[in-house]
Amino acid sequence: VAGHYDTKLENSFRFVGANDGGSSAAFLLEMARELSQTRHKLTYWIVFFDGEEALRNWTETDSLYGSRHFAQKLTADGELSRIQAMILVDMIGDAHLEIHWDQNSTEWLNKLVFTEADKLGYSRYFLRQRVAWGDDHIPFVQAGVSSVDLMGPVGPVKPGDLFGSYWHTAQDVIQHCSPSSLTIVGRVVKATLSELESSPHVQ
């Protein structure tokens, strides 16, 4: 279970990044606490990525620094094949939560997550509107690891802009985030992990 904790470097205004960076970091801390309460059949890694954001402009080489490095290291160490699945969270704290179906994610894992969301009554938050996110799951997908990106907009969405009107602006502050959004995503992720434990060959 992974997310990034860095925020976009902005010199022209005070950028907090409460949702874009902050929400995933807070989520991972609580998920680590939750998962540590009981024993599990699977081994869980809670991974905090640095350098998800571009230093200048987003390109294949100026972005995803931490996840690219980690995927390369796991490959070199022969550890990558041990990973059954990767669940990435990013920008999950908006007060009006919307998680979109990411076409760059692994199909069977997408289906599992959205099925668990439906079971919990969260279908209005997990939308089957298809998008293609570029995020920290990409290096793992490219390396052959089943991965899913749970990501939503930051602030109100305008036509043609799925990132939200507060994305990378001074409006990305905690006042525009909601604890209930983190709770919803947390419950869905825990249900997904439970399903992976009980049915290791679910794909």
Predicted ranges, named:
Residues 85, 94-203:
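Active-site-adjacent substrate-binding region
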Residues 1-14, 188-191:
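Soluble metallo-hydrolase cores and metallopeptidase-like ectodomains found primarily
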Residues 1-3, 47, 150:
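Short, well-ordered beta-strand elements
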Residues 4-8, 51-52, 92, 155-156, ...:
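Short connector loops/turns at beta-strand edges and beta->alpha or beta->beta junctions
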Residues 12-112, 120, 124, 129-132, ...:
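Acidic/histidine-rich catalytic neighborhood of metal-dependent amide-processing enzymes
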